[in-house]
Amino acid sequence: MATKKFTDFPSMTYLYNTSDGHRAIGEYLQQALAAYGITMTLENQEWNTFLETRKNGGYTIARNGWLADYNDPISFLDMWITASGNNDAQFGKDDHKNLACYSVDLTSLGIDYKKTDATWAETYDYVIGLVKSTTDTNTRYALMHVAEDLLMESGAIVPLYYYTDIYMCSEKLEGMFSSPLGYNFFMYSNLK
């Protein structure tokens, strides 16, 4: 199977923090993009420098990671609103503030709100505001799906992998449980 390659595609840099695992992912991305004629260099930064560079938007592509603060999908979604301190992708900020290329239609949810060629604040921020203010669980989850669709359609966020926790547990241990967030609790456990 022939692979078409881009020509005259601008080179880019992938920013990541120091870790053999993060470097390996960067090398994989570099190799995968090279197959399409895209040149990507890798830039490694120490953790604090990396965080500052990312927060200031001083990158083309950067590694990001997130673990939920609490067991609710909004923990992964509200970080991308314009005013969020975790919005390192710079959605709705600075040069992107007036970028009107997003669309949202909430009429199928019974909400009289439809915008085309709108800003991030008029679409994503608005939807997240509704998620945080509604008391109806079904509407709340439907709105979170709308927000997720906006985020994924932007192309700026690309989930690559999820962390997993592998552990061994003796069959003699009773009462230990794990939360969906990956925390292991032993306060009610004992050995048979």
Segments and roles (model prediction):
Residues 2-8, 53-57, 78-129, 133, ...:
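Short, solvent-exposed loop/beta-turn-alpha elements that line the ligand-binding surface or hinge
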Residues 24-35, 48, 52, 122-129, ...:
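Solvent-exposed, polar/charged alpha-helical surfaces in well-ordered, non-transmembrane soluble domains
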Residues 25, 150-159:
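Periplasmic-binding protein-like
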Residues 34-93:
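Periplasmic binding protein-like
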